[in-house]
From Swiss-Prot:
Name of the coding gene: murC
Presence of the UniProt keyword Cytoplasm in the record: yes
Organism, as annotated: Clostridium botulinum (strain 657 / Type Ba4)
Predominant location: cytoplasm
Its biological purpose: Cell wall formation.
Enzyme class: ligase
Source species, domain of life: Bacteria
EC number(s) recorded for this UniProt protein: 6.3.2.8
Pathway it works in: Cell wall biogenesis; peptidoglycan biosynthesis
Protein name per the record: UDP-N-acetylmuramate--L-alanine ligase
Pfam families documented for this protein: Mur_ligase (PF01225), Mur_ligase_C (PF02875), Mur_ligase_M (PF08245)
Length: 458
């Protein structure tokens, strides 16, 4: 089954899980092009309301009746095979497409597809690059995994041949894409509920590299040893970046009082220009270098690259300042992998504060189990750790792993750590223990941000 922008113009397309960040973006692109769109989700949300306002037919709850007029159904990996709409579609021979296949077919309508891959930093880098592309007036279509203020959401429909999107490796989704420029930000062990091991993950990224045409570009973090081992697979143009090595480097790095980096961009030991970031941490210096490399490969002007990078103040849920209460700062971050948590805490330590509270909600049982040892070692820079229960997402609790088990290990290592089972109890603990000048950092890919909002809105 395939999708064609022109041939399928009069089709009714139904999205199962339309409230998801990527699915809603795809639906919005099609609504712009006057497709008939419907979709279902378990809960109403600002996303479903926005789609409804744009003309989509939205159903809350999954029922077989929802797909009665659909010609094509798009679903995500999170949708189970016993979903009533999936079952009904099969019985009625309505065409079904996985989200990644659908996005891949959508990309065929564009010449300059830019796909940002990597275990960490995809949303931030895609968002940063979007700022650069908009400053350069290339009029791109953008699909990003977070809400970006400059496009008032997670999607923008342009009229040029530029398409900018994230390329997630989960279930090898990114192997269904058609990148002209493919970026690999880093490679780390993750999604081990799908991949066998790190070598299996590296093999998937090797295949991603081979998708890039000979006249295209691979942009890669050259100081990542896992990337170094597969970069030879490229038959296209290759641009590497890094702090101490690579084609494009960051020199003379200085951090301001909020941990945001200022640095010179250097190529072949020659300074190209300087930039001042408005997002914190070393990891965002690397994210900006990837964006700069793509901008240069796309023949964007230096001044547009600089303005794009410097106008980027972050996306929602990426080191997002939620507010202050009694001179106590609350920041939220989406980090859910040990490497991401370490980077986020490193940035937070550079941020002005007295005591750093890290409120963490583990994301999925499988990730917590497979990366358990790494989770026990990534919180050392926090002064105090508060653990919520594991956010299940698409999984079921088998009783094998829990937040309490992680808390026990952290306490065994001498770290101050407290477990709570209810958000309200976490809020009350913070009310009692956070003092003037402290920093509360909520961390996780689930709904832990609600704790910060509860605290701010007292």
């Amino acid at each position: 089954m395939s999708f064609n922008f022109i041939k399928d113009k009069n089709k009714h397309i139904h999205f199962i899980g339309i409230g998801g960040i990527s699915m809603s973006g795809l639906a919005e692109i099609l609504l712009y092009h006057n497709f008939t769109i419907s979709g279902s989700d378990m809960n109403s949300s600002p996303i479903t309301k926005k789609l409804k306002d744009k003309g989509a037919h939205i159903y809350i709850g999954h029922k077989k009746e929802n797909i009665k007029d659909a010609d094509l159904i798009v679903y995500t990996a999170a949708i189970a095979s016993d979903n009533p709409e999936i079952i009904e579609a099969k019985e009625k021979n309505i065409k079904l497409m996985d989200r990644a296949d659908f996005l891949g077919d959508l990309m065929k309508g564009y010449k300059y597809n830019i796909a940002i891959s990597g275990t960490h930093g995809k949303t931030t880098t895609t968002s940063m690059l979007s700022h650069v592309a908009l400053k350069a007036n290339v009029d791109p279509t953008i699909l990003v995994g977070g809400n970006l203020d400059i496009i008032n959401g997670n999607v923008r429909v342009g009229k040029s041949d530029f398409f900018i999107t994230e390329a997630c490796e989960y279930k090898s989704s990114f192997l269904k894409f058609f990148p002209y420029i493919g970026a690999i930000l880093n490679i780390d062990a993750d999604h081990l509920d799908y991949y066998k091991d790190l070598d299996d993950i590296k093999n998937a990224f090797s295949k991603f590299i081979k998708l890039i045409p000979k006249d295209g570009y691979l942009v890669a973090y050259g100081e990542d040893k896992n990337i170094q081992s597969i970069i030879k697979e490229a038959s296209c143009n290759v641009i590497t970046y890094g702090i101490n090595s690579g084609d494009i480097q960051a020199h003379n790095i200085e951090y301001d009082e909020k941990a945001c980096g200022n640095f010179d961009v250097v190529k072949n030991n020659q300074k190209l220009f300087s930039v001042k970031l408005n997002v914190p941490g070393k990891h965002n210096i690397l994210n900006s270098l990837a964006s700069i490399c793509i901008g240069l490969a796309s023949n964007m002007k230096d001044k547009d690259i600089i303005e794009g990078i410097e106008s980027f103040f972050g996306t929602h849920r990426r080191f997002e300042l939620k507010g202050c209460k009694n001179n106590i700062t609350v920041i939220d971050d989406y980090a859910h992998h040990p490497t991401e948590i370490s980077a986020t805490l490193d940035a937070a330590k550079k941020y002005p504060h007295n005591k750093l509270f890290c409120v963490f909600q583990p994301h999925t049982y499988s990730r917590t189990l497979t990366l358990f040892d790494d989770f026990t070692k990534c919180f050392d820079k926090a002064d105090e750790i508060i653990l919520a229960d594991i956010y299940a997402a698409r999984e079921k609790d088998t009783g094998i792993i829990s937040s309490d088990m992680l808390g026990d290990k952290l306490r065994d290592r001498g770290l101050k750590c407290t477990n709570f089972h209810k958000f309200n109890d976490i809020k009350n603990y913070l009310i009692e223990n956070a003092k003037d000048g402290d920093l509360i950092l909520t961390v996780g890919a689930g709904d832990i941000y609600k704790v910060g909002e509860m605290y701010i809105n007292l």
